[in-house]
Amino acid sequence: MDMEEKPKYGEPRKFDPSFKGPIQNRGCTDIVCCIIFIIAILGYLAVGILAWTHGDPRKVIYPTDSMGQFCGQGKLEKQPFLFYFNMMKCASPMVLLEFQCPTPQVCVQTCPNRTMTLITAISKPQDWEYYKSYCKEDPGHKAAAQILKEKLCPAYLVSSNPFLQRCFPSMGKKGEVITVGDQEKFSDGVNVLDAKDLMAGMKNASIVMEGRQVAMKIFEDYTKSWYWILICLLIAVVLSLIFIVLLRFLAGVMVWVMILMVVAVIAYGIAHCSIKYVSLKDTPGSNITLQQLGFQPDFAVYLHIRQTWLAFIIILAILELIIILLLIFLRNRIRVAVELMKEASRAIGYVMSSLVFPIFTFFLLAIVIAFWGVNAVFLSTSSEPVYKVFNETECVHSRETCNPENFTSSSMKSDCPHSQCLFAFYGGETPYHKYLILLQFYNVFLFFWCANFVTALGQMTLAGAFASYYWAFDKSKDMPAFPLCASLGRSLRYHTGSLAFGSLLLAIVQVIRVLLEYIDHKLKGAENKFAKFLLCCLKCCFWCLEKFIKFINRNAYIMVAIYGKNFCRSARDAFFLLMRNVVRVVVLDKVTDFILFLGKLLIVGLVGIFAFFFFSGQTDAFKGTAPSLHYYWVPILTVLVCSYLIAHGFFSVYAMCVDTLFLCFLEDLERNDGSAERPYLMSENLLNVLKKKNQAN
């Protein structure tokens, strides 16, 4: 007799009269992974202590002179500005590679406001006293030739202005002629130079600082607009709460209202962009392409180009078309999903504390992000000053490491008489500095692991609470008094290892994706098409793998919360259960996710429209109230991103509730048959949706 073939996706759940929801008598799961996670956390704290001991964030904030000292700090507190002896030396291409001009640099109290040479200043006592404040050290009574040979003082001073704590020549124009300090020409003590000779050096030095200038303007915009940003985010919170409450009582109506309002908001966006596109038709310069315009630090320039608004119209139109087509083809399934959301609304009504639980998760995530950020800053600034040989002409020792204290008597100086030993960058040769890159990698990896762990803890806690609701035959009597707290306690006490296991798998894939993005960035200029194709395939595969692991983890945590089994068994059971009901997974679960996404989109759209009209100053009602900003898109983008995160936090409760109830009623269908002995535990509405019914006793 042939042996009976086992089902491909396991046996359906059997009826168990003793099963009353999340099992109370359970043991610890995945203990080995729990121990590894605790050790990793202790190591993470050790890395933090090590970084805080060696790091110095001032290295990325303050300019550094040729000796590696911070301008405006310590004994140089009254000398906040960095002065370059010869700005024209900054025209070297090495400036863009090493971020260091091959000329002496000193910290000064103020930037020079006069133009003079060493030769003329040394003969006038009053001018000489002023001139010496821009020397590396007091030259005493040395002759001008000796001072220049030892590079104690600059050959000339040029009237300058401070920019990002650095002194740059005050460039101007008289007609078409470039001037410096209102002069077309100046002397360096030997030759008469044109003011334009300084431009190349200034250009390279300013390129290094241009990114910081944009960052400083953005920071300044935040200081002016943070109060209004918080108000916009408060509006997002209020809107999210209103939608959650309305979903509690008017789930069916609210779902269709959300859908129609999202369509309306996108339609308004298309109309607004079209009006802008047409209004710029006769504006001079508006017809140039984005490619011709190139990158501009002032992003408001792009809003005066017709092609920008055309791109917005196309993107919004495609999004609108996709949503409308999905609504047409999924209209029947949306009705089913509405009933599932109504059941989720009732579950949340019994576990009202779940609505504020995202705040707890957000708080833990904020701690993880802050710890990672502080560690990253301190690790990146824990190097020691490294000095290199700089020379204007070819030198055998060029870019070699040197010691400024004995450089003048070293063989390097004798081989290259015109060379200088200048501060180049921060590095180090100690064991700590040699393994610094590994510590930075560990910091990134633990960040992903801990962030995923916090997210997993939130998911398992909510799953346990909502499972308690579903499997309670009498909701008012059989549910625990504090289902959320009870579920959180079970998750931490018994399943820290399972949470760590699932989040570890996800962290590994995410770190690999980060490395692939880094490699892709490095190979952007490469011509090897096969390497690019292979890298693109790897990125696509790992993106899909990350999505799959997130899906499996989410359902595995639900099964762990209910049955208390280890991660692997729970993941297998959840996967098999879903595969045995694969059609229902698509019909109910994913359509519900789409509806919740539309809710997030609606909240972001409403808050984003308000933020746009407020910060752009295009509405008369806000002109006297809105702050004056360099880039008004900075607070708008911030509001959009944070509004989405806020909406996601509140709607994630609904999403987790739906996923949990979905798995529970799939098991309910397998365990029970609607008879008096084995009645379904789902609500009457769900029974009607699934065309099932309980028999009367």
Swiss-Prot record:
**Which catalysed reactions does the entry list for this protein?**
choline(out) + n H(+)(in) = choline(in) + n H(+)(out); ethanolamine(out) + n H(+)(in) = ethanolamine(in) + n H(+)(out)
Q: Name one GO molecular function term.
A: antiporter activity
Cellular location(s): Cell membrane; Mitochondrion outer membrane
Assign the protein's first listed, main location to one coarse class. Answer: membrane
**Keywords of this protein's UniProt record, alphabetized?**
Antiport, Cell membrane, Glycoprotein, Membrane, Mitochondrion, Mitochondrion outer membrane, Phosphoprotein, Transmembrane, Transmembrane helix, Transport
Q: One Pfam family this chain carries?
A: Choline_transpo
Topology feature Cytoplasmic, residues: 1-30, 248-249, 331-353, 457-498, 615-632
Q: Which cellular components does GO assign to this protein?
A: membrane; mitochondrial outer membrane; plasma membrane
- Could you list the residue ranges that cross the membrane? 31-51, 227-247, 250-270, 310-330, 354-374, 436-456, 499-519, 594-614, 633-653
Instruction: Establish whether keyword Mitochondrion is in the entry.
Output: yes
Which membrane topology term applies here?
Multi-pass membrane protein
- Which ranges of this chain reside in the Extracellular compartment per its record? 52-226, 271-309, 375-435, 520-593, 654-697
Please verify whether the record's keywords include Transmembrane helix. Answer: yes
Q: Which family does it belong to?
A: Belongs to the CTL (choline transporter-like) family.
Q: What does this protein do?
A: Choline/H+ antiporter, mainly in mitochodria. Also acts as a low-affinity ethanolamine/H+ antiporter, regulating the supply of extracellular ethanolamine (Etn) for the CDP-Etn pathway, redistribute intracellular Etn and balance the CDP-Cho and CDP-Etn arms of the Kennedy pathway.
For this protein, the record's PANTHER family field holds: CHOLINE TRANSPORTER-LIKE (SLC FAMILY 44), CHOLINE TRANSPORTER-LIKE PROTEIN 2
Q: Could you identify this protein by its name?
A: Choline transporter-like protein 2
Origin organism of this chain?
Answer: Danio rerio (Zebrafish)
Q: Kindly list the organism's lineage.
A: Eukaryota, Metazoa, Chordata, Craniata, Vertebrata
What gene makes this protein? slc44a2
